[in-house]
Design a protein with these regions (language model features):
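A SIS-like phosphosugar-recognition module
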Residues: 1-210
Length: 210
């Protein structure tokens, strides 16, 4: 793993490990935490499920509390984004504790508080999204999701959820790589392009012109 290859040293007494898990029972995550703690690391976990194995292994816990402790649906994207929000808040807290420049912290926190309203706007467009899905998805056997930067992370999450719900093998690539593959297919491409505008959005469109 990346940890064993680059960060796993014999003495980790000056290391803070942040473990992220929805259920707190993921075997590879918990084994990694055990290994880091055995070498002196301090562990803070971001987790949804209270009383889970991961919470017992952690020196500190930040609960996301994004609903039921036990995940009832594999398509629970809210757990993923709650973890991202918790990670940002923890990063700000750590930066403040060490006296780092927090820059536009207040602006960011205000944007975070506005997320519920933004989500309501997206959910209000479900009917339009359904029409698009019904028109295009059945006509294409091959699907792919693309994105860059922060949108690449969102693309990976979308790929996982679509694969779980639709029982399809779905690719996830960086936008600029798309023109080099799928040469024998005419795929349905879902583009994660939140926040892009102007020439950057135009460049993304050019990259996808297979």
């Amino acid at each position: 793993t990346e940890l064993s290859g680059f960060r796993l040293t014999e003495d980790m007494t000056e290391t803070l490990v942040i473990a992220i898990s929805q259920s707190g029972t993921t075997t590879d995550t918990n084994r990694t935490v055990d290994l880091a703690r055995s070498r002196g690391a301090v562990v803070i976990s971001i987790v949804n499920r209270r009383g889970s194995d991961l919470t017992d292994r952690s020196d500190g816990v930040l609960y996301t509390s994004d609903g039921r402790d036990v995940e009832m649906s594999v398509a629970s994207t809210k757990a993923f984004y709650a973890q991202i929000a918790a990670g940002f808040l923890l990063a700000f807290a750590i930066a403040s504790a060490v006296g780092a420049d927090l820059g536009d912290r207040q602006e960011f926190l205000a944007s975070l508080r506005d997320l519920p309203t933004a989500m309501e706007v997206v959910l209000s467009r479900r009917s339009a999204a359904r029409v698009i899905a019904e028109n295009f998805a059945p006509a294409k056997r091959y699907w792919a999701v693309v994105g860059n930067g922060r949108n690449r992370i969102a693309a990976q999450e979308i790929r996982i959820k679509l694969s779980e719900l639709c029982y399809k093998s779905i690719a996830c690539d960086a936008t600029e790589d798309k023109k080099h593959i799928d040469l024998s297919a005419e795929p349905l491409i879902l583009v994660c392009a939140a926040g892009l505008s102007g020439s950057i959005a135009d460049d993304v469109a050019k990259e996808l012109a297979i």
